[in-house]
Design a protein with these regions (language model features):
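Residue-level preference for short coil/turn positions at secondary-structure junctions
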Residues: 28-30, 60, 107, 164
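Acidic, His/Gly-enriched loop-helix segments that form or flank divalent-metal centers
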Residues: 123-186
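Short, flexible, glycine/charge-rich loop motifs used to bind or transfer phosphoryl groups or to couple energy/partner
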Residues: 22-24, 54-55, 102, 180-185
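Structural motif
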Residues: 31-33, 63-65, 166
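Core catalytic region of metal-dependent phosphoesterases/phosphodiesterases
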Residues: 36, 41-149
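Short, motif-level signal for alpha-helix interfacial/capping segments enriched in acidic residues
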Residues: 14-19, 46-50, 169-182
Length: 186
């Protein structure tokens, strides 16, 4: 059927399914933020993570922002894999345990979990290997990590986040190239 001509649509273009872009804005009260990114459980650096958490405790942060690639999602990757390496359930367990540690050590802090390109591997895996369960809440990464139960806010990849005047993105979201060398191109 034809689309009616209107002042807003003088050419009768078909209706759009695009969702208007709106950044996710962190509440102004969440202004003392510990940023953690690219932890890649289970390949994390315990020393570096311990230093970061100690710094967060010293500064009495009220917000923890996990800026993607908190998990590696090795088994959900389509890269060649070593069958002897850890499985996805182990990675999920390590990440859930880490979130429990954050809740224990920073009981008053609000936690935000931004999906990185490595977490996106899970959805891509489902899309290719198990499309019948794609979109089912029980198989969503946020559900598997129990983010809602833990009071953690999940933010999808490719969603700009603003903390005051600061724009926050994960490396793969930078349009200047791959995430590995983002700092070199800013």
């Amino acid at each position: 059927h034809e689309t009616p001509f209107t002042r807003e649509n003088p050419f009768g273009l078909p209706p759009t399914e695009a969702v208007p872009f709106e950044p996710y804005v962190l509440p102004k009260a969440n202004n003392n933020i510990l940023f953690l990114t690219d932890i890649h459980f289970p390949y994390h650096d315990t020393t570096a993570l311990t230093l970061a958490l100690n710094y967060g405790k010293e500064k009495n942060v009220n917000t923890i922002y996990l800026n993607g690639d908190i998990m590696d999602c090795y088994k959900a990757s389509f890269h060649e894999q070593d069958a002897k390496k850890r499985d996805m359930s182990h990675e999920l367990e390590q990440c859930r345990n880490f979130l429990d540690i954050l809740k224990r050590e920073f009981p008053k802090a609000k936690i935000f979990f931004k999906e990185g390109n490595h977490e996106m591997r899970w959805e891509r895996f489902l899309r290719v290997k198990a499309p019948i369960v794609l979109g089912m809440e029980e198989f969503e990464l946020s559900t598997l990590l129990k983010l809602g139960e833990k009071g953690v806010t999940f933010i999808r990849n490719k969603q700009l986040v603003k903390a005051g005047k600061l724009n926050i993105i994960h490396g793969n979201e930078y349009k200047g190239g791959g995430g590995i060398n983002v700092a070199r191109t800013l």
